[in-house]
Regions:
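Tandem CBS (Bateman) regulatory domains
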Residues: 1-10, 48-78, 84-93, 108, ...
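The conserved cystathionine-beta-synthase
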Residues: 13-31, 38-39, 78-96, 103, ...
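A glycine-centered beta-loop-beta connector
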Residues: 27-30, 35-51, 92, 100-116
């Protein structure tokens, strides 16, 4: 199963000049747990629900007073749509990520989340079992 099979095309984006309130509102309205932060129209960071909560806790300021530019720190890790979900999960686990940007060139075309993986766990398991069955046939 490929990353493109389980990520949606809708990506929530907000400018780094906006506030955390803007991003949290957009995330809530889109029923998603992440927001891409753009600096001058270029994807420059990934804000997750956990990041938002941590920023509130650390700063003690209202959401409207926290700028999104603090989250425009780049992408340490990303995956392309043609990679397997297993590969992407390996990246998420090894880097301690709850969400992974999906890039096509310089564009962010989606975000793979832990929720996406869990929602497709049955299909991933079925695919693994089928692949193991084929492997056993090939080895005969």
């Amino acid at each position: 199963m490929l990353v493109s099979d389980i990520t949606t095309g809708e990506v929530v984006k907000r400018a780094a000049t906006g506030s955390l309130q803007d991003a949290v509102t957009a995330m809530h309205e889109s029923d998603t747990s992440y927001c891409i932060v753009e600096l001058d129209g270029i994807p420059s960071g990934l804000l997750t629900e956990r990041d938002a909560l941590d920023a509130c806790r650390r700063s003690g300021r209202p959401l409207t007073a926290i700028s999104l530019d603090h989250f425009a720190t780049g992408f340490d890790v990303a995956v392309t749509p043609d990679k397997t979900v297993y590969y992407a999960v390996g990246l998420m686990v090894s880097h301690g990520l709850e969400a992974l940007p999906v890039k096509d060139g310089l564009d962010i075309v989606g975000v793979l989340t832990q929720e996406d993986v869990m929602a497709n766990l049955t299909n991933l398991t079925r695919e693994t079992v089928n692949n193991l069955g084929h492997k056993n046939k090939w080895n005969k």
